[in-house]
């Protein structure tokens, strides 16, 4: 396509798992689409994985914008929002949406003493 339309910007829109995409719990997708699928694009806007991240293919950013808010216990409360792209410069900015008032809180409690001594820890902020 670039050969026929060299002045155009090529944007990949993809909803699915890409190899090496990570989830909030640290799982790394090994069986997703290979990044070579995006050969020839200027940047990629990806969805499906709720963790905001950028995966590069030959220097080309393939960006999961993440989810607007926390969706389940496996996700952190923070780090959610949206991404705004500048198509001409092919750069993007990340914007967080603050939503710590509502969500799933996961606590680490090692013993009953942790509760009695107010030492329980929230582990998904």
Outline where the language-model segments fall.
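Extended recognition/assembly regions associated with phosphoester-bond processing machinery
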Residues: 1-125
């Amino acid at each position: 396509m670039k050969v026929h339309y060299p002045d155009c910007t090529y944007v990949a829109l993809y909803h699915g798992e890409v190899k090496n995409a990570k989830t909030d719990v640290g799982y790394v997708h090994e069986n997703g689409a290979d990044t070579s699928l995006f050969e020839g694009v200027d940047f990629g806007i990806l969805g499906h994985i709720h963790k905001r991240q950028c995966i590069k293919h030959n220097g080309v950013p393939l960006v999961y914008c993440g989810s607007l808010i926390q969706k389940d216990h496996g996700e952190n409360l923070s780090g959610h929002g949206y991404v705004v792209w500048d198509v001409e410069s092919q750069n993007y900015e990340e914007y967080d949406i603050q939503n710590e008032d509502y969500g799933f809180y996961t606590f680490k409690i090692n013993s009953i003493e942790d509760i009695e001594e107010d030492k329980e820890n929230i582990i998904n902020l």
